């Protein structure tokens, strides 16, 4: 009998040992840790500029928003830019690009570069006021005809309903005067922006690229790419020449191919 129990005990010990050495296939395997390589762009791009965040923010882009025919007052997506960060009072900006600008401004300041906002969101009516002022200006009244006049104005100014500033994603910084950007301070600021703006989600839409059409180079104009590209895509799909009206010269939008030449004339 003792031998019998001894044999049973030996069998149990062997079974347990084999179970330890060869665990059941139903047992949960040990977790495997996978280390992914993270690109520099991922590390330096603000979290709010992710495609998911932008999709949520921009899932309801209306024609009115694309054309600037709305007011940001009372819209919780917009903020009033503090006066110490801008040249003029009462400027609005979409809060996502503005948060990114704050981070960019702080980084620039540490490098000894000053960034101040000179223009941000502009409504259709704001742009119309700029347009009408230039239309009546003596600088353009001597133009041979309306087409020549419009092309002269549109070297640096957009027709109402075609400006990227309608989207709340664009910022003009420091100065729109060429003399500033040709100064030592301006050159330093521009070089810093060229080297660092992308880290905060911004890029220059109007460059000196030879293949680009439309407006002249604007070193002061910086666009929040993750959002503005979605507005751009929506604009091209939604807006036609018939939608751009209500100001002097608007009857020539189609013949001048304003959407193709100017709205689409950006660097990406």
Model-identified regions with their sequence ranges:
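N-terminal Sec-pathway targeting helices
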Residues: 1-10
